């Protein structure tokens, strides 16, 4: 029986596969752009076309509406804006914000000559 097993042969085949991948030489370029400013002039529907050229413009000093925080009511400051800045060019008829009487002489009051007994005004001090 020892002779029966001697005639068998076994073949072992080893296959080695070597896969070589070349590193990809890709490059990624990211370009940074400056943000566009969010500030811009927006005219409301009641802005006057005072030049009749199809463009909206305003010489009213109080047309600007300050941006409000989220949830802040837009009616809180409407009373002040509608009552006024006191300028004659203002088409909204504002009247409230007149400060000329407290700041000094009005344009209708002639300027007062300097008092000779007083020293001339010096440099402004802060």
From Swiss-Prot:
Effect annotated for changing residue 87 to A: Loss of function in inducing TLR2 degradation
Post-translational modification Phosphoserine, affected residues: 73-74, 77
Species for this entry: Homo sapiens (Human)
Tissue: Widely expressed.
The entry's keywords: Acetylation, Phosphoprotein, Protein phosphatase inhibitor, Transferase, Ubl conjugation, Ubl conjugation pathway
Domain of life of the organism encoding this protein: Eukaryota
Basic residues bias: start-end ranges: 89-101
Molecular function in Gene Ontology: phosphatase binding; protein phosphatase 1 binding; protein phosphatase inhibitor activity; protein serine/threonine phosphatase inhibitor activity; ubiquitin protein ligase activity
Biased composition (Pro residues): 107-126
InterPro entries linked to this entry: PPI_Ypi1
Post-translational modification: Auto-ubiquitinated.
Region (Atypical RING finger domain 2): 85-94
Record has Transferase as a keyword: yes
Region (Atypical RING finger domain 1): 52-62
Compositional bias ranges of the Low complexity kind: 10-22
Chain spans, region Disordered: 1-25, 70-126
Residues modified to N-acetylalanine: 2
Subunit relationships: Interacts with TLR2 and UBE2D2.
Entry's EC annotation: 2.3.2.27
Reactions catalysed, as given in the entry: S-ubiquitinyl-[E2 ubiquitin-conjugating enzyme]-L-cysteine + [acceptor protein]-L-lysine = [E2 ubiquitin-conjugating enzyme]-L-cysteine + N(6)-ubiquitinyl-[acceptor protein]-L-lysine
Variant or mutagenesis effect after changing residue 52 to A: Loss of function in inducing TLR2 degradation
Protein name (database record): E3 ubiquitin-protein ligase PPP1R11
GO cellular component: cytoplasm; nucleus
Record carries keyword Transferase: yes
Swiss-Prot/TrEMBL GO biological process terms: defense response to Gram-positive bacterium; negative regulation of cytokine production; protein ubiquitination; ubiquitin-dependent protein catabolic process
Modified residues (Phosphothreonine): 75, 109
